[in-house]
Amino acid sequence: MSADGEFTRTQIFGTVFEITNRYTELNPVGMGAFGLVCSAVDRLTGQNVAVKKVMKPFSTSVLAKRTYRELKLLKHLKHENLITLDDIFISPLEDIYFVNELQGTDLHRLLNSRPLEKQFIQYFTYQIMRGLKYIHSAGVIHRDLKPSNILINENCDLKICDFGLARLQDPQMTGYVSTRYYRAPEIMLTWQKYDTEVDLWSVGCILAEMIEGKPLFPGKDHVHQFSIITELLGSPPADVIDTICSENTLRFVQSLPHRDPIPFSERFASCTHVEPEAIDLLAKLLVFDPKKRISAVEGLTHPYMEAYHDPTDEPVCESKFDWSFNDADLPVDTWRVMMYSEILDFHQTVGVANETEGSEQPDSQVEQNNLDSANGA
């Protein structure tokens, strides 16, 4: 590791990690499509943290916008069951680093290690629902809920992470977004006109996986994915088929043999280790018609959640998220300036809070200098 002014550099998995001297003892913990995550020790607080490197965020306007969106969301969404932003900085190589509290594991790793006992399945489902209630109240859809995006610490506290694909509530949304196993059928059928209900479908898939210890709908491709969904739910109802806009998709659905649904009580009859209420909630989550699917607010009042449900401790977001930037088609340099400005604002806000608490925040002047440079000052 070599020092470079305020930053230190090290090679991890062949990738340069260039972070401020505030963070030491880097160890890789995960690699994703958009970045590398390392654990580290925050010398300012003594806490263990996760440092996520977003690789080449300014290489294209699409990547720059995606990173800007994730930053804005992390700054806006503040809830016990959502990952929070502790620090953010841009390195001299212009990579962006997000810093969060380090969680012990994620649900994907937990499910691969051992079967979950029923009380953990119930508690994790409750916390996911509680977080989604807050997210949806802000006018945000996560769009990529899956076990690897659900972080869990040693106290079984759960936090939803990875808002890179999150979008606003918009009846005309399009795109091929969530990981296939957890993807709602309306995304596969229409690729548009979907809403917060797509997240509840994902919760259903996750709940089923916690119950059985394996993915419920392990599709090899989206055709196979849809086919195995119909094996459980039966053929989609006519009003769902009527929403299909693509002629090719419509022909595909109409070509499938008619299937009758399998009752959930029959399909999950062997799952005697969980309460019948869990299977009832599952049946209300995994519904073809999104308008008939249970919402996060409704899910929290379901009998399966009774042990944890507390209407006085299930907050909503104080304000809707501002999506005004989302349709902007801007050059990379503009996104860069906007990003620096957001980072500076974050450090100034944190700095005021830390001054109140008697600690210091060292990075705001660095970011001000970077912003001046980005603006050509």
From Swiss-Prot:
GO terms for cellular component: chromatin; cytoplasm; mitochondrial intermembrane space; nucleus. A motif (TXY) lies at residues 174-176. The active site is at 144 (proton acceptor). Residues 359-377 have a biased composition (Polar residues). Its cofactor is Mg(2+). Residues 354-377 are annotated as: Disordered. The modification Phosphotyrosine is found at residue 176. The modification Phosphothreonine is found at residue 174. Activated by tyrosine and threonine phosphorylation. ATP binds at residues 29-37, 52. Keywords: Activator, ATP-binding, Cytoplasm, Kinase, Nucleotide-binding, Nucleus, Phosphoprotein, Serine/threonine-protein kinase, Transcription, Transcription regulation, Transferase. The TXY motif contains the threonine and tyrosine residues whose phosphorylation activates the MAP kinases. Belongs to the protein kinase superfamily. Ser/Thr protein kinase family. MAP kinase subfamily. HOG1 sub-subfamily. This is Mitogen-activated protein kinase HOG1. The lineage of its organism: Eukaryota, Fungi, Dikarya, Ascomycota, Saccharomycotina. The gene is HOG1.
